[in-house]
Amino acid sequence: MDILYIIWFDVLPILVFLGGGWFLAGKFKIEVKTYEIVITRVVLPFFVFFSLYQVPLAASDFLLLPAALLLTALLFVLSSLLSKGLSQEPSLRQAICGMASCPNVCYLGGVLTYLTFSHLPFASAGEAAELPKALALLSLLMTLSHLLLRTVGHAIVSRESSSLSSLLLRALTTPVLYGALLAFAAQHFDIPLKGTFLYPVLHHFTGAFMVLTAVTTGVMIRRSHCFTVSKDILLPALVKLLVSPLLALGLLAIFPSMDDLAKEILLLFAAIPCAMDFSMVGTTSAQKSIFQRSLMTQMSLSILTLPLVIFLCRLFFPASM
């Protein structure tokens, strides 16, 4: 019965939002780059700030960061070996490696987490007690994901040499980083936001973030047009959607002090399809084609894999029971 709840409350709403983006892209001239800028520079930082501000995290919760870094490193090694066997073209190998290893939960991660922890089987009797902390934990991974995409992802995919100073500059010019730092500062100095005009505005950013990111992803899918699936696309997608969650399960044995909710978030983080922001890594046209085809393949396959991973979260780590 749980798997039916997961499909009905978690997967189908995402498909509806993606379909809305698909429909709007066919009826109106929508500039995807503008929406990406709004998301990454405005909506996402405010969402991360508000999510982290609402729930003070324990020291053990920050174990998510080294766990996610280890997972990314393992995926990078695995995808590097895989890419060498799939293509002899350096730029295509870089693209394959980037799509299989670089995390980017900033688009669908928030939507999936919100839907998962606000409905059955993770919430009951109209109460979603775990939702605020789940969004806070995901915001940690969103911040890390965005930083990795702008630094490590850029270094992997870009054919230009990247110095340490240039990568550091890219990290320091990441807006979501400052959203997280401001949230921790507001908590540390006990700055109250409730009762001010800012609180309802920040609260509404959660809903805006969910709708805008899902619809924008639908627009991106519409712009990808038709595509063919080949082994250089399918195998990296399977690494991201199937091997990555299995690696995450194995890594959790190294972090026994992590609570069940954090383990669930890490497992979701590992299973979410990559929705790489092309504009942030400056890809060539050949690489962009690989990215678009990989995005479509991962999104299509994730309709089958995500319900299974969410069910495993419930089975192995029953934080909300």
Predicted regions and their residues:
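Alpha-helical transmembrane segments of multi-pass small-molecule/ion transporters
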Residues: 1-321
